[in-house]
From Swiss-Prot:
InterPro entries, per database record: GPCR_opsins, GPCR_Rhodpsn, GPCR_Rhodpsn_7TM, Opsin, Retinal_BS
Spans within the Cytoplasmic topological domain: 94-107, 166-188, 260-296, 354-478
Purpose of the protein: Photoreceptor that binds cis-retinaldehydes. Contributes to pupillar reflex, photoentrainment and other non-image forming responses to light. May be involved in the optokinetic visual tracking response. May be involved in the regulation of retinal hyaloid vessel growth and regression.
Annotated source species: Homo sapiens (Human)
Disulfide bridges in this chain: C143-C221
Region annotation Disordered: where it falls in the sequence: 1-32, 440-478
Transmembrane segments: 73-93, 108-128, 145-165, 189-209, 239-259, 297-317, 333-353
Tissue and organ distribution: Expressed in the retina.
Chain segments annotated as coiled-coil in the UniProt record: none
Protein name, per record: Melanopsin
Single biological process term from Gene Ontology: G protein-coupled receptor signaling pathway
Main location: membrane
Keyword set, alphabetical order: Biological rhythms, Cell membrane, Cell projection, Chromophore, Disulfide bond, G-protein coupled receptor, Membrane, Photoreceptor protein, Receptor, Retinal protein, Sensory transduction, Transducer, Transmembrane, Transmembrane helix
């Protein structure tokens, strides 16, 4: 099935290829596009209605580029696909097996890994195979399905990242408004909305609004952003706005206020620690630093995803502006490969920077734990991993705000169901002070102790997690 050597030109009505019964080239490949083999420009391909592809199979057109260009792109996409499939499958397995990682907030990360895995699984093998033969091999239906999967899973990943940013924004900057909500149920509804939103933007090309067509080196498919028709241009602009730019603005807005809230809470804890003069504030600051690190990790994930899709969006906008004739096959294919490479960023980032993920890998996949350099003592399961939130919500009984939070949480369910982090609990504490009209900065030790209820006898010097003779992770109350 290899194409003949020498210059490749699209089949003409007067020259019948040996592999076809009736030489009827697709309607989107007309004589006006015959210069593609000499100029290396993209054809204007727009099968916007059923039946525009030939009824009998015909060889799709090729572009006049060196063979090694196809092989290079094919090799890159194969490596990207294998890395994306194995890496994201590892993330899914680890997060599902590790109890400490099965929190409502991490449901979004699992969904992101599922979306990235499906992106790699549906895109890389097809792209690689077509690159070996230097032309699209799977016909109209295969092209449409391939492009639909790329759009669906790419949009799902972008909107999932937006949902992560919004979720962190709400629980950190609006803790009282979200306190007590069934987080797992809420996360499930949000993820359902994410997939419905992605589906709503992926289906229109099947109904005549734009189309799914070959692109670049004509070994992969995407939505038609090259045609300069009102319908195609409208779809391209709306897709870029509501799938790329609007989510990007929401993410930027959320993380600006997230880091501002972290900074303000850190100052509040520092002031409180100066008033109390003990080790509690130091422990709280360490937890705050941990939350800040996790926020930075997610911000890095989002930035890499945006940078991966930015070149592809730029190419689409160039064509939208009417300059499709300046786009070469390379200028379309290379950004497409970069966009698909966004599926490999998350597993690599987690493996390098996410401490609990590294430990969970060492526990459930010891061979990978050795590769990541996780020590043997860190790979042993700890009792404290059964809930990542208990130590914070039970370690501050000397303060009435912490006791109120704990009592209310017990009435609502376990920490694993509520899904609060150290940062969120600290934010509730500060927000509760502000809601009562009191400034956290102006409260001294006397004010805080006056509010605290009497402690049980025999526990004046004890706090949960600091029971005599026990380290925090061994406290039976945790």
């Amino acid at each position: 099935m290899n194409p003949p050597s020498g210059p490749r030109v699209p089949p003409s009505p007067t020259q019948e290829p040996s592999c076809m019964a009736t030489p009827a080239p697709p309607s989107w490949w007309d004589s006006s596009q015959s210069s593609i083999s000499s100029l290396g420009r993209l054809p204007s391909i727009s099968p916007t209605a059923p039946g525009t592809w030939a009824a009998a199979w015909v060889p799709l057109p090729t572009v006049d580029v060196p063979d090694h260009a196809h092989y290079t792109l094919g090799t890159v996409i194969l490596l990207v696909g294998l890395t994306g499939m194995l890496g994201n499958l590892t993330v899914i397995y680890t997060f599902c097996r590790s109890r400490s990682l099965r929190t409502p907030a991490n449901m979004f990360i699992i969904n992101l890994a599922v979306s990235d895995f499906l992106m790699s699984f549906t895109q890389a093998p097809v792209f690689f195979t077509s690159s070996l033969y230097k032309q699209w091999l799977f016909g109209e239906t295969g092209c449409e399905f391939y492009a639909f999967c790329g759009a669906l899973f790419g949009i799902s990943s972008m909107i999932t990242l937006t949902a992560i940013a919004l979720d962190r924004y709400l629980v950190i900057t609006r803790p009282l408004a979200t306190f007590g909500v069934a987080s797992k149920r809420r996360a499930a509804f949000v993820l359902l909305g994410v997939w419905l939103y992605a589906l709503a933007w992926s289906l229109p090309p099947f109904f005549g609004w734009s189309a799914y067509v070959p692109e670049g080196l004509l070994t992969s498919c995407s939505w038609d952003y090259m045609s300069f028709t009102p319908a195609v241009r409208a779809y391209t602009m709306l897709l870029c706005c509501f799938v790329f730019f609007l989510p990007l603005l929401i993410i930027i807005y959320c993380y600006i206020f997230i880091f501002r809230a972290i900074r303000e809470t850190g100052r509040a804890l520092q002031t409180f620690g100066a008033c109390k003069g003990n080790g509690e504030s130091l422990w709280q600051r360490q937890r705050l630093q941990s939350e800040c690190k996790m926020a930075k990790i997610m911000l890095l994930v989002i930035l890499l995803f945006v940078l991966s899709w930015a070149p592809y969006s730029a190419v689409a906008l160039v064509a939208f502006a009417g300059y499709a004739h300046v786009l070469t096959p390379y200028m379309s294919s290379v950004p497409a490969v970069i966009a698909k490479a966004s599926a490999i960023h998350n597993p690599i980032i987690y493996a390098i920077t996410h401490p609990k993920y590294r430990v969970a890998i060492a526990q459930h996949l010891p061979c990978l734990g050795v590769l990541l350099g996780v020590s043997r003592r860190h790979s042993r399961p700890y009792p404290s991993y059964r809930s990542t939130h208990r130590s914070t919500l039970t370690s501050h009984t000397s303060n009435l705000s912490w006791i109120s939070i704990r009592r209310r949480q017990e009435s609502l369910g376990s920490e694993s169901e509520v899904g609060w982090t150290h940062m969120e609990a600290a934010a509730v504490w500060g927000a509760a002070q502000q809601a009562n009209g009191r400034s956290l900065y102006g409260q001294g030790l006397e004010d805080l102790e006056a509010k605290a209820p009497p402690r049980p006898q025999g526990h004046e010097a004890e706090t949960p997690g600091k029971t005599k003779g026990l380290i925090p992770s061994q406290d039976p109350r945790m």
